[in-house]
Amino acid sequence: DVNELNDVEERRAVVPQVWEIDIMITKHNDEIIQIEER
């Protein structure tokens, strides 16, 4: 949905810290998953 996408972009513009933290958490979780797969 284009409107939903625009809402997300607007929220990111207002609070860039939030999605940066989300990305850090995602990367952290990916690393944990990789460690568990070994």
Curated annotation (Swiss-Prot):
Q: Residue span of the signal peptide, if any?
A: none
Q: How does it assemble?
A: Homodimer.
The lineage, from the top, is: Eukaryota, Metazoa, Chordata, Craniata, Vertebrata
Q: What is its main location?
A: secreted
Q: Where in the cell is it found?
A: Secreted
Q: What is this protein called?
A: Very early lactation protein
User: Looking at the UniProt record for this protein, which Gene Ontology cellular component terms does it annotate, in alphabetical order?
Assistant: extracellular region
Keywords associated with the record: Glycoprotein, Milk protein, Secreted, Sialic acid
Q: Which tissues express it?
A: Found in the whey fraction of milk (at protein level).
Post-translational modification (record): O-glycosylated. Contains sialic acid residues.
Question: Can you name the source organism?
Answer: Trichosurus vulpecula
